[in-house]
Amino acid sequence: MAAGPIRVVLVLLGVLSVCAASGHGSVAEREAGGEAEWAEPWDGAVFRPPSALGAVGVTRSSGTPRPGREEAGDLPVLLWWSPGLFPHFPGDSERIECARGACVASRNRRALRDSRTRALLFYGTDFRASAAPLPRLAHQSWALLHEESPLNNFLLSHGPGIRLFNLTSTFSRHSDYPLSLQWLPGTAYLRRPVPPPMERAEWRRRGYAPLLYLQSHCDVPADRDRYVRELMRHIPVDSYGKCLQNRELPTARLQDTATATTEDPELLAFLSRYKFHLALENAICNDYMTEKLWRPMHLGAVPVYRGSPSVRDWMPNNHSVILIDDFESPQKLAEFIDFLDKNDEEYMKYLAYKQPGGITNQFLLDSLKHREWGVNDPLLPNYLNGFECFVCDYELARLDAEKAHAASPGDSPVFEPHIAQPSHMDCPVPTPGFGNVEEIPENDSWKEMWLQDYWQGLDQGEALTAMIHNNETEQTKFWDYLHEIFMKRQHL
C-alpha cells in the first residue's frame, strides 16, 4: 500500500481522468431518456467507481449555509482517520456544504480530542482493531466506508465488528449509504450491441473454447479456482491470467494484470469474442457485485456467475445470467452451456435485455435513477464526497436534537444513536468452491487461510468491543484482550 502523501497525489491526479473519461455514457443517457448508447472511455481508462485510494473528485455538494453556523470554528468536524484518504486537496481541512448545512472535513489527527470533532470516518480496508483510537469518546460517531471485498477485513463481517460503527456505506443495499451498483454506470452500459455472430463462430472454428476465465487473484475466500478446475473436466475453458492459466492473452500489455480490470479497447475487443464468461466473485456476500458480473453483460456475453446470492434482484430481466448454484454439479452446468452454445435462439434469449425496452427490472431502474452519486459522472458527486455529506447531515441533525433536549427535556427526547447492523455487510463464513469442507484436508491452503481469517475477525471485533466498554486508553492492551477471548473459545 502506498504511503499517505503518494495516495493524496493520486487523488488529485485522478480528478481529471475521471472527468475526461465520463463525458459520453451517463450524461447522454439522461438527455435521451435513458436510451443513449454507451461510448467507451476515449483513453481506455479503467471503468470503475472512483476508488477510495485513487481517483476522486473535489467538488463540494450544494447546500444552503445555516444561520448561526457561518464561522468554521462553530461547525462540526468530520475527521478522516484512514491514512492518505481525504477527498479534498490541498490542505488538511475543508469546509463542505451539504443538504442540511456545513461541516468541516479534516484529516488532522490532532483534532481527535477536540469537542467539535463529531465523527470519525474510517476506510474498511485500513481499519485495524489493534490501532483503533481509544478511548472512544461518547460524543463521537464512527462512520465506515467499505466498498471493497470483505476479504480485506473480515472483522466487519461479524456483528461485534460492524456494530462498532454508527453509519455505514458498503456494497449492501441495507447499509446507510448503499454502493451496491458502484460498478454499473447506467443502463446504456448494458445496452452495448452484441458482436456479430459470425465473428464468434469463426473464433470457435479456430479452436477457442466457448467459455472464458480471466483471473489473476487466486486462492480467495470464494475458492473459485476449485470449482473452475472441476468444470474444466467437463467443458473446454480458455483460462487467461495467473489462475489455472492454459492460454495467454495476445500481447504483453494485455497480460499485465493491471490491464485486466480496465475498459481497455483492445482487451474488450478480445474478451467480446467469447459467448460465455465465468464470473466468480472473490467473496460471497449479498449485493457484492463487481465488474466480473457487469463487464460480460456490457460485452454481450452471458455471465456464468457465482457471487451475491441476491444477484437476481439486480439483473436487467429474469433471463440474463446463468447462476452456478442453480446446477447440482459442474457437469450439469457444462451440459447446459454446451446446449446454449449449439442453440443460437436459446442463447440469444439471455441477451434480450439489450433490445429497446428489454430492461424490465424496475428495482434496478429505480436504484440507478435515485442514487445521488455517480460513476465517472462529472454532474454528480462521487460516493466519497456523497458519504461525507451524509455523515455531515447526520451530525447536524444530532446536534440540533441534543440542543432541543437540553432546552426542553420534557418536549424533546434524548437522541438515540444509530447503530450499524450485520446486514450492512452480510458475508457468511466462506465455503469450498466445490465439495464439502469436511472433505478438504486440514493443510489445504484455502482452509488454513480463509477459515481462520474469518473467525479471527470475530475475535478481534469482540476484543475491541470489550476494550471500548471498559474505557481502555492503551491500544497495546488489545493483544491481551484478544488472547483472553481466544483462550475462552478454546475451552467452549
Swiss-Prot record:
Which sequence ranges are listed under topological domain Lumenal?
Answer: 25-492
InterPro entries listed in its UniProt record? Alpha-1_3-FUT_met, Glyco_tran_10_C, Glyco_tran_10_N, Glyco_trans_10, GT10-like_C_sf
Q: What residues are glycosylation sites in this protein? A: 166, 443
Q: How does it sit in the membrane?
A: Single-pass type II membrane protein
Q: Which cysteines are cross-linked by disulfides? A: 389-392
Q: Report which reactions are catalysed by this protein.
A: L-threonyl-[protein] + GDP-beta-L-fucose = 3-O-(alpha-L-fucosyl)-L-threonyl-[protein] + GDP + H(+); L-seryl-[protein] + GDP-beta-L-fucose = 3-O-(alpha-L-fucosyl)-L-seryl-[protein] + GDP + H(+)
Its protein name is: GDP-fucose protein O-fucosyltransferase 4
Organism classification, top ranks?
Eukaryota, Metazoa, Chordata, Craniata, Vertebrata
